[in-house]
């Protein structure tokens, strides 16, 4: 028998979509994880703007994953500045994906998604 998870607290994914190739990989990995049901991609800019509904949903999350493409750690810093400290952090450069040298292809997106998947489980 299956268990209803309709009222379960969400697992939220905040990628820094950035302006580079690793930003695109972060974004596409978050979308892939959302499609697979591992979590829900959510609005990083809404945290920066302290949008009430986004802040409340994030406070109620059962898990939070920040995905950053590079060492600037924009997603991590945005979460911290919004008052969140308990979250998993994935930096694509730690997976040897270098800014300006990492095409947003299926292999790189899956590599990032696999790492994110394990951090959310």
Please provide the spans of the model-predicted regions.
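Iron-sulfur-associated redox domains of electron-transfer enzymes in respiratory
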Residues: 1-121
